[in-house]
């Protein structure tokens, strides 16, 4: 996928990249054929973020690329400070391009006396002056409703779909690594025209280890686990082992966001997984032979172009 070149009227457009994922910003810029605008991003001696926009943005439509990944709080605050600087510099509109939306897992009250942090972050973004959000594979789709501004939640499945087809697997089947991810896995299975199986983990009694039940058959099949993010990798590694024990020929995991915290890389290396496929929505710090990274920068570039030209985004995914 390649964004078509900008027309002369794109003179009213500027694109900035924060420090969270500069390589992604450069790649999007390259696909757009439009240079990144400049800003000086620094910190005071006490850690406070300090930003100065290095060129005029008066009357311009601004797109800021900044996934709110690790360090989540610093990257989120940097985004907010940059938006404030742009708004006070008379930008016409400000769109936040968040390949990964941090705090998305705190989308409801799952226990007494806990916050709904995803809603609080949405409030902060709107209050500071963000007028549109472009993100991908939100952990909970209902987060779109936390905003009173347009939210374009892109589907990472578009790049996974092409990759899976290129593998020419003989007897593939889609799997959800847990019951909570069934809707996401079913969507991908429908896109691919494949069957769906589910890994259901249960603890039959207190203080007993989890039992992995497979709903459907994985025997002699190439299983493709589908999830929105891979954090500690515990769930997909346990699911892969259960699937191999049932007779799966191979097990591949697809995860849009490679959070990979803690011992995730070590778990993946030692697991029954044959391959883990992720996108570059988050910079991959550690390398692993089992991990394949697909770029979604061309997708984001084309979406930015379409939004600026008031063209349909949904048609990309149909």
From Swiss-Prot:
Binding residues annotated for D-ribose 5-phosphate, in chain numbering: 203, 227, 231-235
Keyword Endoplasmic reticulum: no
EC number(s) given by UniProt: 2.7.6.1
Catalysed reactions, as listed in the record: D-ribose 5-phosphate + ATP = 5-phospho-alpha-D-ribose 1-diphosphate + AMP + H(+)
Binding site for Mg(2+) 1: 139
Entry annotation: catalytic residues: 201
Gene Ontology BP term (one): ribonucleoside monophosphate biosynthetic process
Binding-site positions, ATP: 46-48, 105-106
The entry's keywords: ATP-binding, Cytoplasm, Kinase, Magnesium, Metal-binding, Nucleotide biosynthesis, Nucleotide-binding, Transferase
Positions that bind Mg(2+) 2: 178
Major localisation: cytoplasm
Names of the cofactor(s): Mg(2+)
Entry keyword annotation includes Methyltransferase: no
Pfam families for the chain: Pribosyl_synth (PF14572), Pribosyltran_N (PF13793)
InterPro entries in the cross-refs: PRib_PP_synth_CS, Pribosyltran_N, PRibTrfase_dom, PRTase-like, Rib-P_diPkinase, Rib-P_diPkinase_bac
GO molecular function annotations of the record: ATP binding; kinase activity; magnesium ion binding; ribose phosphate diphosphokinase activity
Subcellular location as annotated: Cytoplasm
A single GO cellular-component term on record: ribose phosphate diphosphokinase complex
Family annotation (SMART domains): Pribosyltran_N (SM01400)
Entry's family note: Belongs to the ribose-phosphate pyrophosphokinase family. Class I subfamily.
NCBIfam families: PRK01259.1, ribP_PPkin
Subunit structure: Homohexamer.
Function: Involved in the biosynthesis of the central metabolite phospho-alpha-D-ribosyl-1-pyrophosphate (PRPP) via the transfer of pyrophosphoryl group from ATP to 1-hydroxyl of ribose-5-phosphate (Rib-5-P).
Descriptive protein name: Ribose-phosphate pyrophosphokinase
Species of origin: Helicobacter pylori (strain ATCC 700392 / 26695)
